[in-house]
């Protein structure tokens, strides 16, 4: 007798963290996960304006981000739902809010040095959309041949249906939509929402197609349409199905402007920590730190201003994910709140994101009964420095103590501990136990430095050509080889051009000998350099040669 199944992993061990991380690593290898994308930092519009963002408010927030936050690494400018005419019609703007369309606005956003990003729900089709009005035959159907109803947008408004991704004409429409977003609007990062709601079984154009198969077919069409250099962020969907097509993936439910919203999002971030850099780069949803209220939204009583502790909980929760780091506030509201703006500017939190590693929920399976969910997260940033993040999910003040050996730190260490959010040094740890007071609805983020371990500069190795031709695009790659953890790489190409990144491209326009230098900035403040000589030969041709001219054709 034989049993046929998909690939199965069976493993027994006492260390459940190791088991989860092993599973994540195997998923990365088997499914060729896209995990090399940078941890995006920036702003998104949803929790700031919900359906109400208009052209003027968008530009104001873009200008504010560019002026106050871009230098810190916040460069993503994400417009969420509301810009489009209807779900399923994403290249037709909502003329009430964006009377000149989105392309002129995104042009200005790029001019500010920001990266345009946008929201879509790729497989949902509204009854108001062009597809529903003109091609109901492109939709997933029931046994009677009728389009299957799949819900509403909100409050029973706008009935929704599902695009049949196996229908060749629907595929063409999907391809055109995403190609336009990228090639005409200049979008570089695309969120794909509600893929769980549109995951319905039904009658597809291609018989015997399952909902999961249809979703993979649609994702491949989108990836092929946008190319490899555009970031795709899966939102609501099964965790595993989009792996290999998406760069980022939501690991929690929606957040908002309240402590309760953060508390409800936290279990997902804890339980899925091992997915970061294994399935995709984690998307913990946006954090909010302002006192902004949303009077016409009832989401978790968001009409009440968040306390400073609420704000700290929200941003710390995003930081422990080690993934995306997006601000969900109306940015101008931070101009008169320096203590809240300081949270966004906090270098230790930013470094947690730049390192790209998720904090481990130490109490994932044995959290305190009063917390009702994991509350202790630990990030070993390098051999010398670690971050311990502790949430108080309860309504009561607490006196807490944590034995540092439970984090994996050696008992022999001599630890200097500081409070990251309050910029205060903590008194010496007694017998390896960190004791502290914690108010209700709060978080403490401790930086732990082992004085027995000396700070060392990072070691860096480069992959690069030794020669090239003027006008040709060359690739340069930097790798960390031990020492201090690397936060950033800075390239100087010797021709007046500098670029940030571990994997970069550059084109020289003139021949000559150039000294190329890369500087790796380490976590402890030390840096390392590598340099090499590069010979560029020849000149860029300037003659008219029509036989060499090729007609540009957008990807289909």
Model-flagged regions — what are they?
Residues 450-556:
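Extracellular/lumenal mature domains of secreted and surface-exposed proteins
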Residues 314, 318-321, 326, 367-410, ...:
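Carbohydrate-binding surface patches
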Residues 39-179, 185-205:
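Aromatic-lined carbohydrate-binding/catalytic grooves of carbohydrate-active enzymes
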Residues 1-37, 305, 433, 438:
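Beta-strand-rich recognition/accessory modules
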Residues 103-106, 110, 114-117, 206-264, ...:
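Active-site-proximal helices and loops of the catalytic beta/alpha 8
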Residues 414-433:
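Solvent-exposed beta-strand/loop surfaces of large extracellular or lumenal domains
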């Amino acid at each position: 007798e034989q049993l046929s199944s998909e690939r199965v992993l069976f493993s027994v061990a006492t260390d459940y963290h190791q088991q989860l991380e092993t599973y994540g690593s195997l998923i990365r290898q088997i499914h060729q996960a896209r995990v090399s994308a940078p941890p995006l930092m920036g702003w998104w519009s949803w929790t700031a304006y919900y359906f109400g963002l208009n052209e003027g408010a968008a530009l104001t927030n873009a200008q504010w981000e560019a002026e106050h936050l871009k230098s810190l690494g916040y460069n993503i400018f994400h417009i969420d739902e509301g810009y489009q005419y209807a779900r399923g019609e994403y290249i037709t703007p909502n003329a009430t809010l964006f009377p000149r369309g989105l392309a002129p606005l995104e042009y200005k956003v790029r001019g500010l040095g920001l990266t345009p990003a946008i929201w879509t729900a790729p497989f949902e089709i509204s009854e108001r959309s062009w597809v529903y009005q003109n091609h109901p035959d492109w939709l997933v159907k029931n046994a009677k041949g009728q389009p299957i109803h799949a819900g509403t947008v909100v409050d029973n408004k706008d009935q929704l249906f599902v695009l049949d991704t196996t229908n060749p004409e629907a595929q063409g429409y999907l391809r055109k939509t995403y190609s336009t977003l990228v090639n005409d609007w200049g979008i570089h990062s695309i969120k794909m929402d509600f893929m769980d709601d549109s995951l319905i079984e039904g009658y597809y154009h291609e018989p015997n197609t399952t909902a999961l198969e249809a979703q993979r077919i649609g994702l491949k069409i989108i990836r092929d349409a946008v190319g490899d250099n555009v970031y795709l962020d899966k939102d609501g969907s099964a965790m595993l199905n989009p792996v290999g097509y998406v760069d980022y993936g939501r690991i929690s439910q929606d957040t908002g402007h309240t402590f309760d919203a953060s508390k409800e999002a936290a279990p997902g971030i804890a339980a899925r920590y091992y997915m970061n850099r294994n399935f995709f780069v984690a998307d913990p949803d946006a954090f909010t730190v302002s006192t902004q209220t949303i009077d016409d939204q009832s989401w978790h009583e968001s009409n009440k201003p968040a306390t400073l502790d609420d704000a700290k909980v929200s941003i710390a929760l995003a930081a422990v994910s080690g993934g995306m780091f997006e601000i969900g506030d109306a940015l101008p509201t931070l101009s008169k709140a320096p203590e809240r703006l300081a949270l966004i500017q906090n270098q230790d939190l930013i470094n947690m994101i730049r390192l790209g590693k998720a904090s481990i929920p130490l109490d994932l399976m044995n959290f305190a009964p009063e917390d009702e969910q994991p509350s202790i997260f630990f990030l070993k940033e390098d051999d010398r420095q670690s971050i311990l993040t502790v949430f108080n999910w309860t309504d009561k003040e607490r006196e807490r103590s944590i034995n540092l050996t439970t984090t994996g730190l050696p008992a022999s260490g001599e630890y200097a501990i500081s409070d990251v959010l309050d910029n205060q040094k903590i008194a010496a740890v007694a017998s390896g136990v960190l004791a502290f007071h914690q108010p209700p609805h709060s978080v403490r983020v401790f930086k732990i430095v082992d004085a027995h371990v000396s700070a060392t500069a990072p070691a860096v190795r480069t992959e690069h050509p030794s020669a090239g031709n003027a006008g040709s695009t060359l690739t340069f790659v930097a790798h960390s080889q031990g020492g201090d953890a690397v936060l950033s790489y800075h390239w100087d190409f010797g021709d007046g051009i500098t670029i940030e990144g571990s994997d970069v491209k550059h084109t020289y326009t003139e021949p000559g000998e150039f000294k190329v230098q890369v500087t790796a900035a380490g976590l402890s403040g030390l840096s390392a350099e590598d340099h090499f000589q590069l010979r560029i030969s020849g000149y860029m041709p300037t003659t008219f040669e029509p036989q060499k001219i090729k007609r540009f054709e957008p990807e289909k």
